[in-house]
Curated annotation (Swiss-Prot):
Name the record gives this protein: Cytochrome b-c1 complex subunit 7
Subcellular localization(s) per the UniProt record: Mitochondrion inner membrane
Similarity-based family: Belongs to the UQCRB/QCR7 family.
Transmembrane segments: none
Membrane topology recorded in Swiss-Prot or TrEMBL: Peripheral membrane protein
Keyword Membrane: yes
Family annotation (InterPro entries): QCR7, QCR7_sf
One Gene Ontology cellular component: respiratory chain complex III
Pfam families membership: UCR_14kD
Amino acid sequence: MAYLRTGAEFIASYRSSLNRMSDLQQKIKMFGFNNAYYNQVGLLKHDWLPHSPVWLEALRRLPRELQEARDFRIARASLLYASKHVLPKEQWTTIEDDIPYLEPYVNVVVKEMSDRSNWDNFVNPEIYSE
């Protein structure tokens, strides 16, 4: 299977969805984002979300460079948390850089699980055609 990549069109559509928000929605989103702790230690949103079987499978399918970048962000955040420090403000994750990088992989895994479930519950119609 060819690796999915977080393509330029996906990033552009995510950023344009931020721009289409009303002024009040943008202010609320920025308030929540700026008061969150994860961006102050350099994490992305998908780095700290709770793991489920779908997320674990999506993480397993990540390309090596994305896995290594994620591992680095988590290790750095753990060290910062343990020492009760945050990154300098210039190094904080911005809302434009907080791309949902796992979303394409999660969508593929959900579709595959749905297809597998449909095939597992398939009943041959010839049995009932008497």
